[in-house]
From Swiss-Prot:
Predominant location category: membrane
Family: Belongs to the nonaspanin (TM9SF) (TC 9.A.2) family.
Native source organism of the sequence: Homo sapiens (Human)
One Pfam entry name: EMP70
Lineage: Eukaryota, Metazoa, Chordata, Craniata, Vertebrata
Protein topology in the membrane: Multi-pass membrane protein
Protein name: Transmembrane 9 superfamily member 3
Length: 589
């Protein structure tokens, strides 16, 4: 084995450069959140959009609202995560100072012509509401309302702000919309506001607690689903262990007895079972380049999921705009050597020679899938003039991360994988000529095993899927990452158990095509998750329109595919260890 000081040095240098490049972007905090008396407090206007379509958002001033008179304000620097999530912070123009009350005052006037009235009427008909920020605390308000007959429409013109402070920090913000004014063409509408400062006992670190919903996320159903999944894991692990231990013990006893027979008795005997394919079970999988790239990508997705959940459990990422996405991008880039190591080593063990091509496919498989979907949805967002349209500069930044961070780190991982664990070390010799696969019952066919393999893993997570979907597609903040970690562990255990059982029955039917079968049977969980997303869309939401529908099903396809690749890699890795173990313990001539 050759030493790799150069590769290790490159890995260390690349990782250090990556940290310096991306780590500052993982925090959305531009300020210290401390103020002096009379110091300026900025009210940012974010986006406006229909209530039932959370992702269909537009710039606040795309509606004909007017801007306050205050003009001097420092520029806001958005993070990568904010840019990708469509955050569009614009200065409101309102003059607000720390601990300085503002009596009701007019800050601007709307000259309401027919075009502006129609824009407001459309927004009110579609239940538009807007989001604002003060000191990174979100505030929501509705644009207006219609009368019972739907003939007259009214605009809320008075923003009554109550801001709580504890010491020199802002800990609470409340908005009350008042001043309902009927929308009549060719009239002038005065927009006004007031600010009331109140001393609060809320601690700064607890100021986001009001936005959480413990009654929803810690409902008895949530606890029961976790308990139910945990009991299923215990039952499944016990069942698998009992079946395999008893069955394998009988198999080993039968094979040991066969070893004691002479050649004539062995020829007359009825040989069957998984031992018969010992010369083919470690044969390289079909399409090894794609297979190894999928395994490497799945291992990386698992590493990203594990690290991000741990970080979210330690840090309250939900308190900063875009921090979850920024952290995920940073961790994905940083874990690129994991992809290269597992994908490159597997490809080398399977005798692959085009390792550079495999490295490129492994590095860009997931980014290409995500960027391709985002590119398609971006066209629709541009057509709708939605804030979700990704700016060109952000696209360039993402491409730079892919080519100058992910690709070099993936190369380092591939080189390490090929040199450290790329040599075949199978317990059985691979025959030169493949063994014919005998006919078997229909339910032992790989296609049937693949379709059925994802049912139990999906059953262990589908309740958690509801809470995750609701937090993303509705107006809930997901914060119970301990639940998510437990569900991830349960999913891994169930997936490995199911794929081991499926692989055992496949090998016992003397079918040695277990690599793709183990991967796809675990990955089929994604099919059930995507099918569940259809149920959630039609029965749990009131989404409508081309943009929101495309956004929903496009990114749900990305999420389901990534989950499937991760489960497939987990299933294959567990099954590979199982197959190696059982053939190591069998005496082969």
């Amino acid at each position: 084995m050759r030493p790799l000081p150069g590769a290790l040095g490159v890995a260390a240098a690349a990782a250090l450069w990556l940290l310096l490049l991306l780590l500052p972007r993982t925090r959305a905090d531009e300020h210290e959140h401390t103020y002096q008396d009379k110091e300026e407090v900025v009210l940012w206007m974010n986006t406006v959009g229909p209530y039932h379509n959370r992702q269909e958002t537009y710039k606040y001033f795309s509606l004909p609202f007017c801007v306050g008179s205050k003009k001097s304000i420092s520029h806001y620097h958005e993070t990568l995560g904010e840019a990708l999530q469509g955050v569009e912070l614009e200065f409101s123009g309102l003059d607000i100072k720390f601990k300085d009350d503002v009596m009701p005052a007019t800050y601007c006037e709307i000259d309401l012509d027919k075009e502006k009235r129609d824009a407001f009427v459309y927004a009110i008909k579609n239940h538009y509401w807007y989001q604002m920020y003060i000191d990174d605390l979100p505030i929501w308000g509705i644009v207006g309302e219609a009368d019972e007959n739907g003939e007259d429409y009214y605009l809320w013109t008075y923003k009554k702000l109550e801001i709580g402070f504890n010491g020199n920090r802002i800990v609470d913000v409340n908005l009350t919309s008042e001043g309902k004014v009927k929308l009549v063409p060719n009239t002038k509408i005065q927009m006004s506001y007031s600010v009331k400062w109140k001393k609060s006992d809320v601690k700064f670190e607890d100021r986001f607690d009001k936005y959480l919903d413990p009654s929803f996320f810690q409902h008895r159903i949530h606890w029961f689903s976790i308990f139910n999944s945990f009991m299923m894991v215990i039952f499944l692990v016990g069942l698998v262990s009992m079946i395999l231990m008893r069955t394998l013990r009988k198999d080993y006893a039968r094979y040991s007895k066969e070893e004691e027979m002479d050649d004539m008795d062995r020829d007359l005997g009825d040989e069957y079972g998984w031992k018969q394919v010992h010369g083919d079970v470690f044969r390289p999988s079909s399409h090894p380049l794609i297979f190894s790239s999928l395994i490497g990508s799945g291992c990386q997705i698992f590493a990203v999921s594990l690290i991000v959940i741990i970080v979210a459990m330690i840090e309250d990422l939900y308190t900063e705009r875009g921090s979850m996405l920024s952290t995920a991008i940073f961790v994905y880039a940083a874990t690129s050597p994991v992809n290269g190591y597992f994908g490159g080593s597997l490809y080398a063990r399977q005798g692959g020679r085009r390792w550079i091509k495999q490295m490129f496919i492994g590095a860009f498989l997931i980014p290409a899938m995500v960027c391709g979907t985002a590119f398609f949805i971006n066209f629709i967002a541009i057509y709708y003039h939605a804030s979700r349209a990704i700016p060109f500069g952000t696209m360039v930044a993402v491409c730079c991360i892919c080519f100058f961070v992910i690709l070099p780190l993936n190369l380092v991982g591939t080189i390490l994988g090929r040199n450290l664990s790329g040599q075949p070390n199978f317990p059985c010799r691979v025959n030169a000529v493949p063994r014919p696969i005998p006919e078997k019952k229909w339910f032992m066919e790989p296609a049937v095993i693949v379709c059925l393999g994802g049912i139990l893993p999906f059953g262990s997570i589908f309740i958690e899927m509801y809470f995750i979907f609701t937090s993303f597609w509705a107006y809930k903040i997901y914060y119970v990452y301990g639940f998510m970690m437990l569900v991830l562990v349960i999913l891994c255990i169930v997936t490995v158990c199911v794929t081991i059982v499926c692989t055992y029955f496949l090998l016992n039917a003397e079918d040695y095509r277990w690599q793709w079968t183990s991967f796809l049977s675990a990955a089929s969980t994604a099919i059930y998750v995507y099918m569940y997303s259809f149920y959630y869309y039609f029965f749990k939401t009131k989404m409508y329109g081309l943009f929101q529908t495309s956004f929903y099903f496009g990114y749900m396809a990305v999420f389901s595919t990534a989950l499937g690749i991760m489960c497939g890699a987990i299933g294959y890795m567990g099954t590979s260890a199982f197959v190696r173990k059982i053939y190591t313990n069998v005496k082969i001539d």
